[in-house]
């Protein structure tokens, strides 16, 4: 017979085992849930994939089949982009054609019906926001500063017609009849002509704009003799005109919009309203789904010019920085390509006062960053939100713009493997701003090695991204089973 103490001890032991058994059951349930999430993730936890479509060269059946294959393959969403094919007529099947509009909407409907996300590039191709048939000379199209340079040796003067074309190698670019004069400036040169860069005196710049004479025959002349006969000068003629940056494939030539003036966004709106948002049934699906406008790497180009511009760039700069930027525009000539983060921060010309050069260029790129946000990213985002569409953008690397502030002006910031070389330290240029804004950060992943990738290569890229603080992967790229036809 058990004593009272033994009975009490047995009861207490059993009572102690009950919470332990309960905890073990909870641990098993938690482990099972974690395993389920990894082995059978919900659609919201999956990665996405981009599909560069061969213009409108697919049949309805193959479009449906490809989208279904993406869904069955475990992808959360699809990013759609028009790409050119040599054997396909751009006029009939390119971006902006009736057939392209049909194919794009069919792909969107199919994906949205499956509960997938859909992203649309901001134009044909991936490089820019562009519009087929846009007047390249209008303020809605990308505008640049075209620079023409003359050398005035010591003791010399100049007279007669001013040069009206720019030579770049064997090519000649005329100043268009629609071009607008920005200004003419004489800059003292303090180094020899063979110096790289040519050094100048930023404190002795002389404006000559008011000395220009428009003759009756349309010729523009300038007569000027330097007061200091011992100085040599560079004369810079600055004109604003369209960059005429094209993006194929399109039914009409598609020109890059102006990223620094809201006229560019107005042109983009007109296209979207006429070609994408003109279907009420699809618009209802967009409102209920997850649709994004996607801006890929910012590959806008000054073409043969030296800087981006808009009608009131000089006025905006003066209001924000307190001085005239026009006399210093020559400092933007020949600046190196920043796609791979070149450390050199001077171009063909420099100032004797390098601190002044650094300040001037930083001020210019700060103002342009502000205009990029205020006149492009933010009004575009506000307008698209009316239709239930979010914005996703590979923020401003590759250009002389600040790369963290624009994160505030999009819904989803993005980086890419190709430019950042899958380096965690480079990714931090994006993760800091994204975390401060508490925004989902994605990456275009798999763009570096093409078909040379192994599965382990893909995994390593993904691991690096997640370790760096990224939340979302968009794989580059979907290989369609069916070719055009």
Regions found by a protein language model. Give the residues of each.
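Active-site mouth loops of central-metabolism enzymes
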Residues: 50-61, 448-454
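Bacterial N-terminal signal peptides
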Residues: 11-19
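Glycine- and acidic
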Residues: 47-53, 86-93, 247-261, 357-369, ...
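Bacterial N-terminal signal peptides that target proteins for export
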Residues: 1-11
């Amino acid at each position: 017979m058990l004593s009272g103490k033994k009975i009490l001890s047995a009861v207490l032991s059993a009572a102690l085992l009950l919470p332990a058994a309960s905890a073990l059951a909870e641990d098993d349930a938690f482990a099972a849930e974690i395993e389920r999430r990894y082995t059978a993730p919900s659609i919201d936890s999956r990665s996405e994939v981009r599909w560069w479509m061969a213009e409108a060269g697919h049949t309805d059946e193959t479009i449906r089949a490809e989208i279904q294959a993406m869904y069955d393959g475990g992808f959360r969403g699809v990013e759609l982009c028009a790409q050119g094919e040599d054997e396909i007529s751009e006029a009939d099947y390119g971006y902006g054609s009736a057939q392209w509009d049909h194919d794009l909407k069919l792909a969107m409907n199919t994906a949205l019906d499956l509960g997938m996300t859909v992203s649309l590039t901001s134009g044909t191709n991936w490089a820019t926001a562009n519009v087929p048939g846009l007047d390249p000379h209008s303020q809605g199209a990308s505008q640049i500063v075209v620079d023409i340079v003359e050398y005035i040796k010591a003791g010399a003067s100049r007279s007669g017609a001013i040069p009206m074309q720019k030579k770049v190698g064997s090519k000649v670019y005329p100043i268009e009849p629609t071009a607008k004069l920005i200004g003419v400036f004489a800059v003292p040169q303090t180094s020899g002509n063979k110096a790289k860069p040519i050094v100048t005196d930023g404190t002795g710049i002389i404006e000559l704009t008011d000395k220009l004479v428009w003759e009756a025959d349309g010729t523009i002349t300038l007569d000027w003799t330097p007061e200091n006969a011992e100085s040599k000068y560079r004369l810079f003629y600055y004109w604003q005109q369209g960059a005429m940056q094209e993006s194929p494939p399109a039914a009409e030539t598609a020109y890059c919009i102006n990223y620094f003036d809201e006229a560019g966004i107005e042109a983009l709106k007109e296209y979207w309203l006429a070609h994408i948002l003109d279907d009420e049934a699809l618009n209802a699906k967009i409102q209920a789904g997850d649709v994004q406008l996607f801006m890929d790497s910012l590959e806008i180009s000054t073409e043969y010019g030296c800087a981006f511009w808009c009608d009131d760039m000089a006025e905006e700069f003066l209001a924000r920085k307190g001085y005239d930027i026009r006399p210093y525009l020559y400092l933007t000539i020949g600046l190196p390509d920043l796609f791979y983060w070149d450390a050199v921060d001077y171009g063909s010309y420099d100032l004797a006062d390098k601190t002044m050069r650094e300040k001037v260029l930083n001020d210019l790129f700060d103002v342009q960053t502000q205009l990029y946000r205020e006149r492009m990213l933010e009004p575009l985002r506000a307008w698209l939100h009316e239709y239930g569409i979010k914005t996703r953008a590979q923020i401003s690397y590759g250009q002389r713009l600040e790369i963290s502030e624009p994160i505030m002006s999009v819904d989803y910031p993005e980086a890419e493997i190709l430019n950042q070389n899958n380096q965690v330290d480079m990714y931090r240029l994006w993760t800091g701003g994204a975390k401060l804004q508490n925004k989902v950060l994605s990456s275009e992943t798999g763009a570096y090695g093409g078909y040379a990738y192994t599965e382990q290569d893909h995994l390593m890229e993904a691991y690096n991204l997640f370790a760096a603080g990224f939340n979302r992967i968009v794989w580059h790229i979907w290989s369609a089973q069916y070719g055009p036809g």
